Swiss-Prot record:
NCBIfam families: met_syn_B12ind (TIGR01371), PRK05222.1 (NF003556). 5-methyltetrahydropteroyltri-L-glutamate binds at K19, N148, D556, Y579, R582, C583, W628. The active site is at H761. GO terms for biological process: methionine biosynthetic process; methylation. It comes from Dictyostelium discoideum. Keywords: Amino-acid biosynthesis, Metal-binding, Methionine biosynthesis, Methyltransferase, Transferase, Zinc. This is 5-methyltetrahydropteroyltriglutamate--homocysteine methyltransferase.
Length: 825
């Protein structure tokens, strides 16, 4: 018999209950006992929902207050030494470990430390009862493989020690606690643990002066780490755990150091098997193809494997299946865990019947392709709010679990003819038959819908020429023209921000009232204009050089543009976690994309009338819009990206024609779109960079094109970054210990650049001294003539006053360096 299973469930809740609860905890608005009570309610509700959807194998330990990798960092006692003052403060006041946990994720600054930095009393993270001056930044964040989710990067010392810890008020390690919690309501779960090899390979050296020279260097810590896995799995066996899912997504990478990797995996899984010989181990891979790594996997003492069939070709799946031992469980990721389209159940049944013909049914588990962390919670609240024809094509997490449940039922109970038609047993509930029939009709309607296709858009894509993918002149010529035009710009160390400014409760309320028609469009427009005025006043008081309008009209840098572009649809509650408590609501691209009307022209040109300084036009680039949306799956992603590129190009032209001299086209997502396999990179990078160039190159030399990139390791794609040919590139760098700058030095980057001077994801206020030190480090790698001074990302999630104080300090730094280098000249 085939069984139904799940790899992971969205954490936030149907109405983002977790986000609100955690943020209230940070602000001291909820007591510890109530906090733990409500967390438990969320977890139990999620387990019950999965059971009610018909899932037999339900995960535990997939829940997290911030990030699953951060959970493992704390669980394994791998807390960097700079957080020792936070740890000690918890010991002194009897806290539960969560202050340290959240400090690693978002930084920690006591009121006393904030006062010393800013001369104002500002509270950072939830306070210690023992008031000390503690000021520590957050750990680095990176994108989780090629998704828009961010994980906290583990840090390892030369002689890193690990120990299994309890935190968060638990009397046992988190995976143990959550298994027992589910068991208390009669739900037997399969705990999810990040595998030891993936955990180490996702990490970095804690010493920025001695970075790892190879991505495999962190494996030196394997033997020390395995002690905690051994202890954890012994505890699993002791409490009656029958099966554990060990996530090893790096097994979809090119693992060139074959013997090193083989020895590491063999050692690790031998230790785990010996510690818990009676537990069935399922190795979960996802986001790519296993390919040659199947030989390594099948040599390990485990009991099963999960295959992502959505990201694997049919020939790859067939090849892998032939090598799996006959005694193993095979988890088939048949439902797309990363997109929102309704599964074609007939097509999936054909695929699964072919697999079962080779493997038999008794060892088959059906599952999503990956954790449903990357998919919204449920379609329940979208009924009547999303265009009905498009809504009929969609499936969110709960709907996907029901698809898995149906496929499991059909494979176990139904018969199939040679024409792939399905015959239900006589006692089948009419609702099951109706469910299948409606699925067939939905998929047929989507294939035939006239909503999807626009012949004019398709024709424009075919007419793209090489001349549309390059600027008229090289950067030195353009730079001279831009400096002549931008007369207020200082010769050295110009300052700017990345775009968005803090969105207060008042801004969010006004937007909500506008969308619910509680205020008129005219009243909302006036409110936005007033916010823009205040934003420009703050920037001028801070003495910034290139200003922004603040983006108060925008909820999200992708959602806003999608609302103006044809081919997009938006949900009311389709939230997914991005990092920590931050959620995003990705638009859904269902058809051909074009720009019926200008998107940013009105507020950008209005803002420019309020200042004599340059006002940046703020746009999101085509690759980022693509990456941060749920994308149609009926044509190549490259085709959709070129369509978006043409739409952005039209907007850039309009801004230039209205006198906007600086236009920023953000592309923070270019690197995250890279396929997991190196052999697939060139094809992706070709169309991704071409799409950006298509959007950015149709301007005069005197128009300065900016772009922003964040959470990116540029070393291995530097030639592609150079090919973007932006006049000013701003990058997230504050969390990366300046390691990105070494790539710019190595490859001789000659355009202007603004590495992030401080981390906006942390509530702490950066000091002048901290930022001066960072600039001094930057100048070891970059020319004074090319360096811009700016934060590392947009300021939307920060508080207005801490933002103002941080920018004042940042401008002080720029002025000091202008004075230093003016004197040198």
């Amino acid at each position: 018999m085939v069984s139904s299973s799940n790899l992971g469930f969205p954490r936030m809740g149907e109405n983002r209950e977790l986000k609100k609860l955690v943020e209230n905890y940070w602000q001291g608005k909820v007591e510890e006992t109530q906090f733990q009570k409500e967390l438990k309610e969320i977890r139990i509700n999620h387990w019950k929902l999965q059971k009610e959807a018909g899932i037999e194998i339900i995960p535990s330990n997939d829940f997290s207050l911030y990030d699953q990798v951060l959970d493992h960092i704390h669980l394994f006692g791998a807390i960097p030494k700079r957080y020792t003052p936070v740890v000690e403060s918890e010991i002194e006041d009897g806290s539960n470990g969560l202050r340290t946990y959240f400090a690693m994720g978002r930084g920690y600054q006591t009121s006393k430390a904030a006062t010393q930095v800013s001369e104002t009393n500002t509270q950072g993270a939830f306070a210690s009862k023992v008031e000390k001056s503690i000021d520590v930044g957050s750990m680095e964040m990176k994108k989780w493989f090629d998704t828009n989710y961010h994980y906290i990067v583990p840090e390892f010392e030369d002689s890193q020690q690990f120990k299994l810890t309890n935190y968060g008020g638990y009397s046992e390690p988190k995976p143990i606690h959550e298994f027992l919690e589910a068991k208390s309501i009669d739900i037997e779960t399969r705990p999810v643990v990040l595998g030891p090899i993936s955990f180490l390979l996702l990490g970095k050296s804690s010493d920025s002066s001695k970075p790892y020279s190879s991505k495999f260097d962190s494996l030196v810590h394997l033997n020390a780490l395995l002690g905690v896995y051994e202890e954890l799995f012994k505890q699993f066996e002791k409490i009656g755990v029958k099966s554990v899912q060990i996530d090893e997504p790096v097994l979809c990478f090119d693992l060139f150091e074959t013997e090193l990797i083989k020895n590491a995996y063999t050692t690790a899984f031998n230790v785990i098997h010996k510690a818990a010989p009676n537990i069935n181990i399922l190795i979960a891979t996802y986001f790519g193809e296993i390919r040659e790594n199947i030989d390594l996997i099948t040599s390990l003492p485990v009991n099963g494997i999960h295959i992502d069939t959505i990201r694997s070709s049919s020939s790859e799946v067939e090849s892998v299946l032939t090598k799996i031992p006959t005694s193993w469980t095979i988890s088939i990721g048949i439902i797309d865990g990363r997109n929102v389209w309704k599964n074609d159940l007939t097509k999936s049944l054909v695929t699964l019947k072919n697999i079962i013909a080779k493997t038999g049914s008794d060892r088959i588990l059906l599952a999503p392709s990956c954790s449903l962390l990357h998919c919204p919670h449920s379609l329940t609240r979208e009924i009547g709010r999303v265009e009905s024809q498009v809504l009929d094509w969609l499936a969110f997490s709960l709907e996907k679990l029901k698809e898995i449940s149906f496929l499991t039922y059909a494979l176990n109970k139904c018969t199939f003819t040679t024409e792939n038609t399905i015959t239900f047993p006589e006692d089948t509930c009419s609702k099951i038959k109706e469910y299948y029939q409606l699925n067939k009709e939905s998929n047929q309607k989507r294939r035939e819908s006239k909503l999807i296709h626009n012949d004019i858009v398709k024709k424009r894509v075919t007419e793209i020429t090489p001349s549309m993918l390059k600027r008229e002149n090289p950067f030195p010529v353009r730079r001279e023209a831009q400096r002549k035009r931008l007369t207020t710009l200082p010769a050295l160390f110009p300052t700017t921000t990345i775009g968005s400014f803090p969105q207060t409760k008042e801004v969010r309320l006004a937007r909500s009232n506008f969308k619910s028609k509680k205020i008129t469009p005219e009243a909302y427009d006036q409110f936005i204009r007033d916010e823009i005025r205040k934003c420009i006043k703050v920037q001028e008081e801070c003495e910034l050089d290139v200003l922004v309008h603040g983006e108060f009209e925008r909820t999200d840098m992708v959602e806003y543009f999608g609302e103006y572009l044809a081919g997009f649809v938006f949900t009311q509650n389709g939230w997914v976690q991005s990092y920590g408590s931050r959620c995003v609501k990705p638009p859904i691209i269902y058809g051909d994309v074009n720009r019926p009307v200008p998107m940013t022209l009105e507020y950008t040109t209005f803002a420019q009338t309020l200042t004599t300084k340059p006002m940046k036009g703020m746009l999101t680039g085509p690759v980022t819009i693509l990456q941060w949306s749920f994308v149609r799956d009926d044509q190549p992603r490259s085709e959709t990206c070129f369509q978006i590129g043409l739409a952005i190009r039209d907007e850039v032209t309009d801004l230039e024609n209205k006198g906007i001299a600086c236009i920023q086209i953000d592309e923070p997502a270019i690197r995250e779109g890279l396929p997991l396999r190196l052999s697939d990179w060139n094809q992706y990078l070709k169309w991704a960079i071409d799409s950006f160039l298509l959007s950015s190159t149709g301007v005069k030399d005197s128009t300065q094109i900016h772009s922003h990139m964040c959470y990116s390791d540029f070393n291995d794609i530097f030639e592609s970054i150079q090919r973007m040919d932006t006049d000013v590139l701003t990058i997230e760098n504050s969390k990366s210990d300046l390691k990105l700058l070494k790539a710019f030095e190595k490859y001789g980057y000659t355009n202007e650049i603004g590495p992030g001077l401080y981390d906006i994801h942390s509530p702490r206020i950066p000091s002048v001294e901290d930022m001066k030190d960072r600039v001094e480090q930057m100048l070891k790698y970059l020319s004074t003539n090319l360096l811009w001074i700016n934060p590392d990302c947009g300021l939307k999630t920060r508080e207005p006053e801490t933002t103002r104080l941080a920018l004042i300090n940042m401008v002080k730094v720029a002025k000091q360096f202008r004075e230093i280098y003016a004197n040198k000249e």
